[in-house]
């Protein structure tokens, strides 16, 4: 009840049309759209398609004068079917792991089998009065039947702003829906309509009507067709199964029989036969208004002349002819097969807008609206229509925003990558571990799980000698240094670690930083400046790209490990101050850089080399000195960077090189100068880990054997997994949602791995890199 008006609005909701008198449902004066007519709703309810829960909304004045009518239904909707990047095979796989993935119950206002304005009104001026009442009733119904989302669908552009003004304060957000195709009929015959087209466009339409002469196909025009209902359902299912366009209804023989029964004199079926056998149909409907509606179609794709006959085009032309003969002013052609429909004279694509709201969570509301905008495919359009659509897309995106354009946090409101994973129930980041990381680890709520995703390659994070060294340093020095290394933050422990690292790598000097990421930022931003050129492998770690941007230098890429491409880049940049920046081992792929060729090219072209050995130190080379040492070119690397958070079981990083270079970084590397020093416990743990790793070389052999064992076993099972002689085994899956779902499924099954997607993984690949501390029997 709307009590804010002198004449209250009374709202009633019925669960079946059988409880409603047809005369009380239909609005007077031709205001009821065809699709919302009583008899047009009957086939959907009577056939039981899609297991819908039906609700029929009636808003009247207290004296019984009708104000508005709306068709509501509650339906389970698989949002994953709208994701164009998720193939049916991947979707099936995820559903097997997580049966409820992206499946929600929607309470929708609109029509299931056609596109039409969702709300019929006595007068357009009643919208502001009726729509809030409708939204309130939907809210209550959603609460009662457990619907996750509310959706008011298929709003016309001309009504959009008024709907927005009413629904946005109620928590709804807009999204572009599936676009429909209409043509305005202004001709007295099909021949006149074809005369509006060029010869090139007219000829295919005209010849499509020659199916009898060219292929021996006959067509029946039927007003009663219940006896053909099983055939119609079978032919329709062929279209649903094969169509690339999204279809959500699931029609059965009862639906077609009910259409014949309830829509006699207001529907027509064209049944195409070849040698007496039904091969295709087109079913159209019309009401008292000016619209002629193409409702459903089906075809046998195994029919021998299927492609050449183009019966869909022929049926469109027969429909246009019938619409003209009935003096209809508009032919509504639905939401699929845009390319063919746009060949019809006067055809235009019309955007439709959905208004969405989660029943309880505003974040889910925003996420769904963004996902719908992103996932629903837009048709390829002529330039004039395309420009209009682009304007609508931008307008809807702006109206989706919960924050104004000038607010810097608007980008936060616009993202839906991680909130989408949460909505789908496959978000697994930030798992909580409750114990030390060995070959297994205790996870909160999961218990003991196998650990196949860790940077502790040598398993030294729990080694007694390393743990005791860390504890002793804390007892001796305290928990932190409370200052920059440049000032009060340098301990004798730091100095001795720098000396040991320099000696370990055969370099004159080394300098510490608080993290590996900081080490790259500090070194590269100090060494490079505007006018310099940084040349990077396309698959370098994110920190190296961030460091290049921070430096202000120009930078360019060469294809991953493509030395011919690198040589061309060096020739093209001859005469500039240059440095090649490269990962020794690529953390997402497990591949090893061709450092020998890089060193040779750098010497030939007078270029410096900066190598990040983070994932190689401790694992590759003599005594674990890294890939450069393994390839015999460590002395030719101008700057060597490494981190302590991998093999050395701690945290922090360092840069090693000639003393003048290192001293320059000490005084100019912001990440070193303006950060607190490495905690004493971390420095001492690194000291101890270095000692243990050199004393126990079998640890390196074991981790590489485990990686090879893992890669071989996965490849044998058909996975794209390769062993590159490092501790990292990537499994490439090709889709981010699958990678995240697989990761969560494995974790809940007792195995931890790392899911990786851009920007962590470049090139659009998605996968699970296994970083192995485990022995083969555990694997």
Segments the model singles out, each with a brief description of its role:
Residues 484-488, 498-522:
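Short loop-beta-helix segment that forms the pyridoxal 5′-phosphate
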Residues 556, 560-611:
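Active-site phosphate-binding strand-loop segment of PLP-dependent enzymes
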Residues 702-708, 716-750, 764-765, 772-774:
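Conserved PLP-binding catalytic core of the aspartate aminotransferase-like
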Residues 2-9, 75-77, 157, 166-196, ...:
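Active-site/acyl-donor-binding loops of N-acyltransferases
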Residues 53-55, 60-61, 67, 73-174, ...:
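Acyl-donor binding region in acyl/amide transferases
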Residues 468, 472, 476, 503, ...:
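PLP-dependent enzyme catalytic core of the Aspartate aminotransferase-like
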Residues 623, 629-664:
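Active-site PLP attachment segment
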Residues 6-89, 139, 149-307:
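A conserved beta-strand-loop-helix scaffold within acyl/acetyltransferase catalytic domains
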């Amino acid at each position: 009840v709307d009590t804010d008006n002198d004449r209250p609005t009374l709202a009633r909701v019925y669960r079946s049309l059988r409880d409603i008198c047809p005369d009380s449902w239909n609005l007077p004066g031709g205001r009821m759209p065809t699709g919302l007519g009583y008899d047009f709703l009957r086939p959907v309810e009577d056939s039981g398609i899609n297991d819908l829960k039906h609700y029929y909304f009636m808003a009247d004045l207290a004296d019984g004068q009708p104000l508005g009518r709306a068709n509501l239904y509650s339906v389970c909707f698989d949002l994953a079917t709208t994701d164009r990047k998720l193939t049916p095979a991947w979707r099936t796989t995820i559903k097997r792991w997580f049966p409820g993935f992206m499946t929600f119950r929607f309470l929708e206002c609109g029509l299931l089998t056609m596109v039409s304005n969702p709300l019929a009104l006595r007068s357009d001026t009643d919208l502001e009065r009726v729509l809030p009442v409708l939204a309130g009733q939907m809210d209550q119904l959603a609460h009662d039947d457990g619907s996750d989302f509310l959706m008011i669908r298929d709003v016309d552009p001309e009504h959009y702003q008024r709907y927005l003004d009413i629904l946005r304060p109620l928590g709804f957000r807009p999204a572009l829906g599936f676009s429909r195709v209409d043509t305005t009929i202004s001709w007295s015959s099909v021949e006149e309509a074809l005369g509006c087209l060029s010869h090139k466009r007219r000829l295919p339409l005209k010849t499509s009507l020659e199916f009898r002469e060219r292929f021996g196909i006959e067509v029946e025009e039927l007003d009663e067709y219940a006896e053909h209902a099983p055939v119609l359902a079978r032919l329709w299912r062929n279209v649903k199964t094969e169509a690339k366009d999204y279809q959500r209804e699931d029609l059965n023989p009862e639906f077609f029989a009910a259409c014949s029964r309830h829509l006699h004199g207001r529907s027509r079926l064209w049944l195409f036969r070849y040698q007496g056998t039904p091969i295709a149909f087109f079913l159209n409907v019309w009401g008292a208004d000016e619209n002629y509606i193409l409702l459903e179609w089906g075809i046998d794709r195994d029919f021998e002349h299927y492609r050449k006959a183009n019966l869909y085009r022929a049926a469109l032309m027969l429909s246009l002819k019938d619409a003209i003969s009935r003096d209809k002013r508009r032919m509504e052609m639905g939401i699929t097969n845009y390319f063919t429909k746009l060949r019809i004279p006067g055809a235009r694509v019309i955007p439709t807008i959905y208004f969405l709201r989660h029943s309880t969570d505003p974040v889910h509301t925003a996420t769904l609206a963004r996902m719908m905008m992103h996932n629903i495919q837009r048709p390829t359009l002529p330039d004039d229509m395309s420009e209009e659509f682009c304007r609508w897309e931008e307008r809807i995106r702006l109206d989706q925003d919960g924050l104004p354009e000038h607010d810097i946090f608007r980008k936060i409101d616009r993202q839906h990558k991680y909130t989408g994973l949460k909505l789908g129930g496959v978000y697994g980041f930030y798992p909580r571990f409750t114990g030390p990381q060995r070959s297994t680890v205790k996870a909160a709520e999961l218990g003991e799980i196998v650990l196949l995703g860790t940077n502790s390659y040598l398993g030294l994070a729990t080694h007694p000698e390393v743990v005791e060294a860390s504890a002793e340093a804390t007892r001796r020095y305290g928990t932190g240094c409370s200052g920059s290394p440049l000032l009060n933050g340098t301990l004798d422990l730091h100095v001795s670690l720098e000396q040991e690292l320099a000696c370990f790598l055969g370099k004159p000097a080394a300098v510490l930083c608080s993290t590996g990421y900081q080490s790259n930022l500090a070194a590269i931003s100090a060494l490079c400046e505007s006018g310099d050129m940084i040349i990077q492998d396309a698959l370098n770690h994110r920190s190296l790209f961030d460091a290049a941007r921070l430096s202000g230098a120009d930078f360019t890429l060469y294809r991953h490990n493509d030395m011919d491409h690198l040589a061309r880049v060096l020739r093209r940049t001859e005469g500039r101050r240059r440095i090649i920046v490269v990962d020794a081992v690529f953390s997402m792929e497990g591949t090893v850089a061709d450092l020998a060729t890089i060193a040779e090219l750098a010497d030939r072209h007078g270029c410096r080399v900066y190598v990040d050995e983070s994932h190689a130190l401790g694992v590759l080379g003599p005594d674990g000195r890294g890939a450069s040492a393994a390839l015999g070119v460590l002395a030719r690397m101008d700057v060597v960077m490494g981190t302590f958070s991998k093999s050395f079981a701690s945290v922090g990083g360092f840069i090693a090189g000639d003393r003048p270079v290192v001293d320059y970084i000490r005084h100019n590397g912001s990440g070193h100068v303006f950060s607190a020093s490495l905690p004493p416990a971390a420095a001492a743990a690194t000291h101890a880990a270095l000692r243990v790793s050199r004393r126990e070389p079998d640890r390196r052999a074991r981790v590489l054997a485990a990686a090879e064992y893992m890669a071989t076993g996965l490849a044998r099972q058909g996975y794209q997994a390769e062993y590159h002689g490092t501790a990292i085994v990537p499994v490439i899956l090709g889709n981010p949602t699958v990678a995240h779902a697989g990761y969560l499924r494995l974790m809940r099954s007792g195995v931890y791995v790392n899911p990786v997607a851009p920007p962590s993984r470049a090139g659009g690949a998605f996968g699970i890199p296994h970083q192995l501390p485990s022995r083969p029997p555990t694997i």
